[in-house]
């Protein structure tokens, strides 16, 4: 099994925490570092959340704080879904884990420039850190093996009728990434909403046990409430974790190559990922877009990672 080297760029966030849990434990993933961006909440809160998850699960991977603001637009947060802390629900022990002193953007640039072109970037929040790194040092572009991101939709948005939250939170950054020429894989809402975490799934992870099972339960029981109140869903989709699933085994997710463009015009479609599903524009595809996921396979993978945190001694 190939071990994929990745940098996980996230804005924790309930589903981000599940992505961290999976990426740090599965043997197919070599998690080099975790970079944090503002998104689901402000940077001070998302950073604390990322550190809390790492401390709770004893994940010894360096964590770097990144961009506190979008490139251009006024900052927004998703407190309607993730609460005031950005990770409401779990109760953590007093935090002793600290972030690295290096800025996340510098870490991304330095790590890529020193690499053999074998590192995959996995941004599952707004694309601010990735876009700024690309603009600061364009020489990183050929060094990026692939970008596997959570964001966008070829159908309906979730923050506006047109736009998904991660892209809407920094459309200009997304525009930079989608025009970069780097190989892109997009896990949008059309796919990620197929991973609704029902009470049955939560009970399954509770039975699996260990610290990750406990954390999963605390996290996803909170989103049961907010996702139903906001979207009428039967549970919280674990949007970000689909990227980790794809990296572990892309055969579990069906994708379609499309030309994708981010709308940065101020108007009702601001932040929309315009996906040319039928190829009517005649432009070459720049993105593999997630279409369907094998949910039985996916939840089995999540459970495998949860069980990996159970100590046997």
From Swiss-Prot:
Enzyme class: hydrolase
Disulfide bridge map: none
GO cellular component: a single term: cytosol
Catalytic activity: a pyrimidine ribonucleoside + H2O = a pyrimidine nucleobase + D-ribose
Transmembrane segments: none
Cofactors required: Ca(2+)
Cofactor note: Binds 1 Ca(2+) ion per monomer.
Catalytic residues, chain numbering: 11
Residues that coordinate or bind substrate: 227, 239
Record-level GO BP terms: purine nucleoside catabolic process; pyrimidine nucleobase metabolic process; pyrimidine ribonucleoside catabolic process
GO molecular function list: calcium ion binding; purine nucleosidase activity; uridine nucleosidase activity
Family in the record: Belongs to the IUNH family. RihB subfamily.
Description of how the protein assembles with itself and partners: Homotetramer.
Function: Hydrolyzes cytidine or uridine to ribose and cytosine or uracil, respectively. Has a clear preference for cytidine over uridine. Strictly specific for ribonucleosides.
HAMAP family (UniProt xref): Pyrim_hydro_RihB (MF_01433)
Protein name per Swiss-Prot or TrEMBL: Pyrimidine-specific ribonucleoside hydrolase RihB
């Amino acid at each position: 099994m190939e071990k994929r080297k990745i940098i996980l760029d996230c804005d924790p966030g309930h589903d981000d925490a599940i992505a961290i849990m999976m990426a740090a434990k599965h043997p197919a993933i070599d998690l080099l570092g975790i970079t944090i961006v503002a998104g689901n909440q402000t940077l001070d809160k998302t950073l604390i959340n990322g550190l809390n998850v790492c401390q709770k699960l004893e994940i010894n991977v360096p964590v770097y704080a990144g961009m506190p603001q979008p490139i251009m637009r006024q900052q927004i947060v998703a407190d309607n879904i993730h609460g005031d802390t950005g990770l409401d629900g779990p109760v953590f022990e007093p935090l002793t884990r600290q972030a690295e002193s290096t800025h996340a953007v510098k870490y991304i640039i330095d790590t890529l420039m020193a690499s053999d072109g074998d590192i995959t970037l996995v941004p599952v929040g707004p694309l601010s850190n990735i876009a700024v790194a690309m603009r600061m040092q364009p020489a990183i572009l050929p060094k990026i093996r692939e970008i596997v991101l959570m964001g966008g939709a070829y159908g309906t948005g979730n923050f506006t009728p047109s736009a998904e939250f991660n892209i809407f939170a920094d459309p200009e950054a997304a525009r930079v990434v989608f025009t970069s020429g780097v190989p892109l894989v997009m896990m949008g809402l059309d796919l990620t909403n197929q991973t609704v975490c029902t009470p049955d799934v939560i009970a399954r992870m509770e039975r699996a046990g260990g610290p990750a099972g406990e954390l999963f339960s605390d996290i996803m029981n909170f989103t049961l409430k907010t996702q139903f109140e906001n979207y009428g869903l039967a549970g919280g989709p674990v949007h970000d974790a689909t990227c980790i699933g794809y990296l572990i085994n892309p055969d579990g997710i069906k994708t379609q190559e499309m030309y994708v463009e981010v709308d940065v015009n101020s108007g009702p479609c601001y932040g929309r990922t315009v996906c040319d599903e039928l190829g009517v524009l005649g432009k070459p595809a720049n993105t593999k877009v997630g279409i369907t996921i094998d949910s039985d396979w996916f939840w089995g993978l999540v459970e495998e990672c949860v069980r990996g945190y159970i100590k046997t001694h």
